[in-house]
Amino acid sequence: MNVKRKATLKFGICIGLLCVSFTGFNSLFGSTHAEAKSIENTKMTSCITNQKFVQLEKKFDARLGVYAIDTGSNKTIAYRPNERFAYASTYKVLAAAAVLKQKPIEKLNDVIRYTKEDLVTYSPITEKHLDTGMSLKEISEAAIRYSDNTAGNILLQQLGGPKGFEKSLKQIGDHVTKADRFETDLNSAIPGDIRDTSTAKALATDLKAFTLGNTLTTDKRTILTDWMRGNATGDELIRAGAPAGWEVGDKSGAGSYGTRNDIAIVWPPDRAPIVLAILTKRFTKDAEYDNALIAEAAKVALDDLK
């Protein structure tokens, strides 16, 4: 075999592996022509979708992690699904879910008191209730709907601190997410630092377990998803990239190095829901994030799942 032919062959194999389009394997598994054509079209769509994510990274000069699960068809969309990103405030919905798992619903009415010294930057709800305290339900709602950082810290404290939160995720099968610090230190997002990081796949899988699986009882799942549907910080994110008429419940996050994240449940009309996690980061500490990157990545993923 000459060198030119060998190089061409290697290139062809690489392309075949990248787009997973070896139709020659169909006969080995007894696929009909129609089935083979359907499988090939699905795989080629995934390859095209992958390239769209590459282009978004170039357009926004950012790094992107995406994982989507269509719970009706079990089809997944994945782009850098196992790469670590700072999770930022997305943890708040998972921490609230873990608290729901641990406590009877009536305990959500327990009043939690805190002091001025407990307040951290960006606590728009908890700072208004220093004199009276807030119920655990109100604190959870403040953390999810308004991304209140003091509320987030209180949820972590309810779980035994960041490591208690990490343990609660391990109990549902997540051995990837690393939780180490409270607000607001957890948003530092220093490249190479695995503290307070996760992956798009891990976060999407956790969210699916809490909102659509049997980890929580039906009444607790309803409480959690109602909080997510009322999120006031996500209108420019996954919600902006979803088709008209598709309902979105989400939890956003932001941090240093242009970190901007959103994890969501998406309810298309008359179909099973879709779980979607989009994590992004840039390359300098003071880089600004761009909400449009999340919205456009969501559109790419959800269009592929239409």
From Swiss-Prot:
EC number: 3.5.2.6
Function: This protein is a beta-lactamase with a substrate specificity for penicillins.
Similarity section: Belongs to the class-A beta-lactamase family.
InterPro entries tied to this protein: Beta-lactam/transpept-like, Beta-lactam_cat, Beta-lactam_class-A, Beta-lactam_class-A_AS
Residues that span the membrane, as ranges: none
Extra remark: The class A beta-lactamase family has a specific amino-acid numbering system, sometimes called Ambler or ABL numbering and often misspelt as Amber. A multiple sequence alignment was used to derive a consensus sequence and then the consensus was numbered taking into account insertions and deletions. This allows use of identical numbers, e.g. for active site residues, despite differences in protein length. UniProt always uses natural numbering of residues, hence there appear to be differences in numbering between this entry and some papers.
Catalytic reaction list: a beta-lactam + H2O = a substituted beta-amino acid
Keyword annotations: Antibiotic resistance, Hydrolase, Signal
Source domain of life: Bacteria
One Gene Ontology MF term: beta-lactamase activity
Cleaved signal peptide residues: 1-34
Active site: 89
Protein name according to UniProt: Beta-lactamase
GO annotation (BP), single: response to antibiotic
Keyword Hydrolase part of the UniProt annotation: yes
Annotated residues for binding of substrate: 251-253
PROSITE patterns assigned to the protein according to its UniProt record, in alphabetical order: BETA_LACTAMASE_A
Coiled coil: none
Source lineage: Bacteria, Bacillati, Bacillota, Bacilli, Bacillales
Organism in which the protein naturally occurs: Bacillus amyloliquefaciens
